A protein has these predicted regions:
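Alpha-helical transmembrane segments of multi-pass membrane transport proteins
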Residues: 1-235
Length: 235
């Protein structure tokens, strides 16, 4: 019975995906088809209704839309721009300044919004214009933004870790958050290393002149409210 249901799910899912049906609808239809094909109709209807209700009543899921909403509000409020300026003030002298700035800002923005897609959209849109003006390859810029935004999936608060906690049967969200810091930071550092190596190879230089401590102080003060949100989101 279990093998039959699995085969039905796979067959219906593949057919629907091949026909271009959105993934969410394809998964829902294939799951319902498997239930209807393996148990009585009345029981199938009750089972589908019960599982739908249980899935929608998980309180932890409410954190995900609120984190995304917070990220969008912060983006509209200019937080992403202040974070970009702050990271640029620190890492701007390195080869490929815009690449490493993109990576560092994605890590910080992901730690605020909990969403890799929000970080990629907010930070990438600001980095893109400057990268085009300075002659960066758009493919390299886009790849750097996409790869480094994944640190937002690991550095808490993470929507992916919340979803994993629910899917795994109640693994502690706090424990997952604590376990996500080191991998997220390591991923960001690895992206920085690759970004610098690419910059050296392609001839992308850092900002000219000496390190500007005054500019760093100004950018830090401007970004301080944004940086404090990392602690607020975790609390």
């Amino acid at each position: 019975m279990a093998i039959q249901a699995l085969l039905v799910i796979l067959a219906v899912l593949l057919v629907l995906l091949f026909l271009g049906v959105p993934i969410s609808y394809a998964i829902a239809v294939s799951s319902l088809t498997a239930i209807l094909s393996s148990i009585d109709l009345n029981v199938a209807v009750l089972t589908a209704a019960q599982r739908t209700f249980v899935g929608m009543s998980k309180f932890s899921l409410t954190a995900i839309p609120f984190f995304i909403l917070a990220g969008n509000i912060m983006n509209q409020g200019g937080i992403a721009k202040r974070l970009v300026d702050f990271v640029m003030a620190i890492l701007g002298k390195m080869p490929g300044a815009l690449l490493v700035t993109n990576i560092g800002t994605n890590a910080l923005f992901g730690a605020i919004s909990g969403s890799a897609s929000a970080a990629a959209a907010a930070v990438g849109s600001m980095i893109r214009d400057g990268a085009d003006e300075q002659g960066y390859d758009p493919a390299v810029t886009a790849a750097t933004n996409a790869a480094s935004s994944c640190s937002g999936l690991l550095i808490p608060p993470s929507n992916a870790l919340i979803t994993y906690s629910l899917a795994s049967g109640g693994t502690s969200v706090a424990a997952l958050f604590m376990a996500g810091y080191i991998p997220g930071i390591i991923w960001a550092l690895c992206c920085c290393v690759v970004g610098v190596l690419l910059a050296v190879k392609l001839g992308y230089k850092g900002t000219p002149g000496k390190f500007d401590w005054k500019n760093l102080g100004i950018c830090t003060l401007r970004a301080l409210p944004s940086l404090s949100l990392i602690i607020v989101c975790l609390l």
